[in-house]
Structures are given as C-alpha cells and as structure tokens.
Amino acid sequence: MTVTIENIHAREIFDSRGNPTVEVDVRLTDGTLGRAAVPSGASTGDREAVELRDGGARLQGKDVSKAVANVNGEIYEALKGQSPFNQAKLDHLMIELDGTKNKSRLGANAILGVSMAIARAAANSEKIPLYRYLGGVDLELPQPFFNVINGGVHADSGIDVQEFLITPVKRASFRDGLEKIANIYHTLKKILADKGLETAVGDEGGFAPKLGSTENAIATLYQAIERAGYVPGEEIAIAIDPASSEFYDDKEKVYHFEGQKLTSAELLTYYEGLVEKYPALISIEDGFSEHDWAGFAAQTKVQGQKIQLVGDDIFVTNPEIFKEGIQKGVANAILIKLNQIGTVTEAIEAISLARKAGYKTMISHRSGETVDSFIADFAVAMHAGQIKTGSMARSERVEKYNQFLRIEEELLGLEVTK
C-alpha cells in the first residue's frame, strides 16, 4: 500500500513565554501521526523568515490564527495525497506556494510546523526513530552548551551579554557531561544565594542575577566550576552570546556596551582581552551586529584561529546569506535555528554548506520554546557537533537533554526491550 498524506491539521498552542504558537498534526493513510510545535525567538535577526502573527487586539496582537488557517487551507490542499517520504520535495512545494523570499505570505511558523510534522510522521510510519530517519545509521551526539546565566533581552539582569554558557569538553558520555553541568548549576545557585543575588531564572532556564558586568559573570562561572570540583578550560569550558545587534546603534555605528560607546575596533579589543584573561572562554556568538559585517570579519581574522566565532543573526540559517558570509570570511561557525529559515530542508542545506566550507555548526532552540524535542533528534541526525538548548531548568529546555539520554541509550544498545 502506498502511504500518502491524508490530513494536515494545525492548532494554536502556547509556548514557554505564554505566547501563541503553531502546532501541526500530519496524519498519513496508514494511520500514522506526526506532530510538531514551532518555537519563537525574542532576539531575532532582521532577515529571518517571517513569523506570521495577526497583529490585532487578541492576545496582544501575537495570535497565530492566520498561520493556522494557512496550514488547514492552502498548505493542506497542496500536500494532500503526496508521499511523506520526500522531505525536500514537500518543503519546496510549500516554498513555491508561499511565493515570497521570506515566507511572509503563509508564514514561516506555518510552513515549519508542517515540515517538521511531515518528517516525524514519515519516521513513525517507517517505525524508526526520527534521528535515524533523518540521519541514517552513522550518528553522533553533539556537545551540549548550557545557558546558565541569562542577560540581555532574555532577562532583566542589567547585563548586556545575552547568554553565558558552560559546556563539558571532557566527558565519558552525554550523561556524564549532563551530570557535570547539573552539579555546576546547583553550585552556581548556592553561590548566587550566598551573595544575596537573585536565583530566579530567565526565559531559557538560566539564572538572571544582577552581576553588573560580563567579567563578573564569567568570574562567577569560574568559581562555580571550581567549587563543583572541575577544572575550567580543561573539563568545563565557557561560551558567551553577546547578541550584539541588540546594543548596536546602526546610525552612530557604535556599540552601547556596559555604559560605554565602543567602536567595532574597541569592542574587538575588549573581546581579545576577555579571552586572554579567561582562557576557558572558547566560543563567542554574535560578537558583532548583523549590520556590522566588517567588524565580524575583523574579529574572525584576529580571533578565528583561537576560538569559535558563531554567526547567528548575521546568517539567520539562510543558505544564500551564509554563502556571502563564507566568501567574506565572517565567523567560523554557524548557528542553526529551524524557525529562522522555515523548513527542515533549508536547514539541512545550511549545514551542508558549513561542512563544505569548514565551518562548525551548532543547533539552537529559541527563547520561546515548547516541549517538542525535534531539534535533539535533528542534531544527532545531522552530525551537528554542538547544540544549545537552555539550562538545567524549565521543562521545555530539559526535555531536549532528556531526549539525548534516550538516544544515547538506544545507540549504545541499552534500551529495555520487552
């Protein structure tokens, strides 16, 4: 029996920030169901695919009833009766149906929900895990980066840098690495509490204390790592995401950072000093604005052989924009966010480009998440090498890490059989 798409149904659900988002069910003729929920970002690149929201009085203008209607109407009509096993064909059908460069007519949130749900339905129909359906048999778990201190637009902490992350560079297994991070997370919480600082968490599950500066935050991470019994730089490394587009003045061409106005050259000097002072700092994401390609390229020339420099807002997971970045020598790694581009196929294309150009890849969640663990399977399938999906708090973050534990068991043949 030939299996085809029988029904596609979208609904409005809520994400981890209390905002509406799109969830899609794809039902196949063999009775198989694939379900996917779409995340949403707070710090977004200007050239991201368009998240369609209604903009009216309902739900602060953020409702997604138009995107839902587009799935249940046009997209369903275009895809019904199609085989679910040709992901690229179906994704390109939706891209053509939308007819815009940035998916603004149907909405990237509508298209991505269907794209992800189709992949999951196809995997379920084949009775294999999603990571194996997307990636075949040659698979590996990524190195996880945990956002344990939140700043920027993700928290009201007074720190300009948006994310301070830790990663287990020395680990026997994914579980071993996760346990190390859990130990540091709880140690960090105690250190903050002992200092009388806030231990409430931000959007991504990290703490949001008013530490005053980037250096204070990094020094506090060093303290937590050491007090938990690990060696900074040797066992546990640090990464930051300044999300510098958020504090860049495009008119003055300066960065409003920690009470100062810094030129691109001055900000680069600051980053150089930071890496020299804190050698456990191995990765900087979006150190320069998406509108400051020259600044980003200069950083890559100076620091690109020493540390990882990740492009997020500057590339927005868009293969065409990324090609330009490769040609101009911008960054040495790319962040992959499915909802920045709007289809599984285009995200895979960006990863393929990175591999050919010698760039590293890091899969990422968004600040507005759901309990959908699609990106965990996707990271394993794509040999992404790295992932960041929040801290060790908030179920929508931890669910991705728990999915890696399940996948690790399966890959090691440790799962319970009945």
Curated annotation (Swiss-Prot):
Residues bound to Mg(2+): D241, E285, D312
Annotated residues for binding of (2R)-2-phosphoglycerate: Q162, K337, R366, S367, K388
Pfam families given in the database record: Enolase_C, Enolase_N
Cofactor requirement: Mg(2+)
Family: Belongs to the enolase family.
Active-site residues (renumbered): E204, K337
Main subcellular localisation: cytoplasm
GO CC terms of this entry: cell surface; extracellular region; peptidoglycan-based cell wall; phosphopyruvate hydratase complex
Protein role: Catalyzes the reversible conversion of 2-phosphoglycerate (2-PG) into phosphoenolpyruvate (PEP). It is essential for the degradation of carbohydrates via glycolysis.
EC number: 4.2.1.11
UniProt GO MF annotations: magnesium ion binding; phosphopyruvate hydratase activity
Family matches, as PROSITE patterns: ENOLASE
Reaction catalyzed: (2R)-2-phosphoglycerate = phosphoenolpyruvate + H2O
UniProt lineage: Bacteria, Bacillati, Bacillota, Bacilli, Lactobacillales
Coiled-coil zones: none
Associated pathway: Carbohydrate degradation; glycolysis; pyruvate from D-glyceraldehyde 3-phosphate: step 4/5
Descriptive protein name: Enolase 1
Protein location: Cytoplasm; Secreted; Cell surface
GO biological process annotation, one example: glycolytic process
The record's free-text note on cofactor binding: Binds a second Mg(2+) ion via substrate during catalysis.
Keywords: Cytoplasm, Glycolysis, Lyase, Magnesium, Metal-binding, Secreted
